[in-house]
Amino acid sequence: MNLNFSNMNMSDLEEIKDILVSDFDDFWTYSILKDELNCSSSHYIVAKLNNEIVGFGGIKVVLDSADIMNIVVKKNFRNLGIGTSILNEIIALCSSLNLSSITLEVRKDNEYAISLYKNFGFETLGVRKKYYNGIDGFIMEKKIAK
């Protein structure tokens, strides 16, 4: 599979809006993502396969750390390694920005994502009780070697 990555821009938002509406039932909306793109501390990438956006991910930089805001893969492209590739790109981006760590929050019941993050060296730091509509969330962190 030949994925291409690029920085997300405003022209990508219409296609991403369709992914958010059909495939992502969480709290991210078109307007939130648009605001994120206008924020200087936010960095978002898109994954394209044959010029179709099949996923995206983003971070917000806080001091010398990054918070992963989201990693989203279109439903009919899941379990193909795209999420893994997006996470690889995010880690490379954080390294290029000379950041010291990456943090994220993940639903306790999202076993696939938790396993992926652990494989990349993320460790659980704590729990946010009932953070996701009554479901606990894990706070995870990965240190970046400089």
Label each PLM-derived region with a short phrase.
Residues 4-76, 87-89, 93, 97, ...:
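Acetyl-CoA-dependent GNAT
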Residues 100, 107-114, 130-146:
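C-terminal "cap" of GNAT-fold acetyltransferases
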Residues 59, 124-125:
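Short beta-strand "wing" residues that participate in macromolecule-binding interfaces
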Residues 71-88, 97, 101, 107-115, ...:
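Conserved glycine-rich acetyl-CoA-binding loop
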Residues 66, 80, 138:
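Glycine-centered loop/turn positions within well-structured domains
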Residues 33-35, 127-130:
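Short, solvent-exposed loop/turn elements at beta->coil junctions and helix N-caps
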Residues 20, 103, 128-129:
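Basic, alpha-helical helix-turn-helix
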